[in-house]
A protein has these predicted regions:
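Append "and occasionally in soluble cytosolic enzymes with long acidic Gly/Pro-rich linkers
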Residues: 2, 60, 80-170
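Ligand-site clamp/hinge motif
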Residues: 3-50, 169-170
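Short beta-turn/strand-loop junction motif enriched in small, turn-promoting residues
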Residues: 3-7, 56, 75, 142
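Extracytoplasmic
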Residues: 12-14, 54, 65-67, 108, ...
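Structured beta->alpha junctions
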Residues: 21-23, 76, 157
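Pocket-flanking alpha-helical
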Residues: 25-31, 44-58, 70-74, 78, ...
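Periplasmic-binding protein-like
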Residues: 61-72, 116
Length: 173
């Protein structure tokens, strides 16, 4: 509720703000389209290209300073090996992830600092290079991935994060 003790209370036009925590992106999208929510910053991955194509007036795509990354457990016996970690990095097609999975105008990031950060464009030495990834795995004793152990990826409950994790899983196979 509006705070009557706020120093400029007479100029505050909102009487109250209600926050509805919604754990499912599709549910939140439906609630927004049904008028149950006035604001959302969530667009389900599968809806974004449709909203862009149809010129949805409620869709605003703005620059967002963020990167998507996985922390690697370097204490894991296999992941202690730098070449294995590099192979995993070289096997990820970041451009394909933003074009085919997230599909909402994101830019592929190749470093922790996202593209366009105050004019900073980082040089990367980890481009998509599946041949080099296979070579590094083979040099580490895993020719064609034979004998390579199963690794687990932990991610939050977002459907978009699940789809990205599945894409990366496929790229690593």
């Amino acid at each position: 509720e509006k705070n009557p003790l706020y120093w400029d209370a007479d100029r505050v036009r909102l009487n109250e703000i209600r926050y509805f925590p919604v754990s499912n992106e599709s549910t939140e999208d439906r609630m927004f389209r049904a008028g149950q929510l006035h604001v959302t910053n969530v667009v389900p991955l599968e809806k974004c290209p449709i909203y862009i194509e149809n010129g949805n007036p409620n869709l605003r795509i703005e620059p967002y300073m963020g990167t998507y990354f996985y922390r690697i457990n370097t204490l894991h016996p296999i992941l202690k090996n730098k070449d294995i970690r590099l192979a995993l990095a070289f096997a990820i097609n970041r451009k394909q992830i933003v074009e085919k999975v997230s599909k909402c105008g994101q830019a592929a990031a190749y470093s922790f600092t996202p593209p366009g950060s105050a004019g900073y464009e980082p040089d990367t030495d980890v481009p998509f290079n599946p041949e080099l990834a296979r070579s590094l795995l083979a040099d580490s004793g895993y020719e064609n991935g034979d004998g390579f152990p199963v690794l687990e990826i932990l991610f939050n409950t977002s459907e978009g994060h699940r789809k990205i994790a599945l894409a990366i899983q496929q790229m690593w196979q």
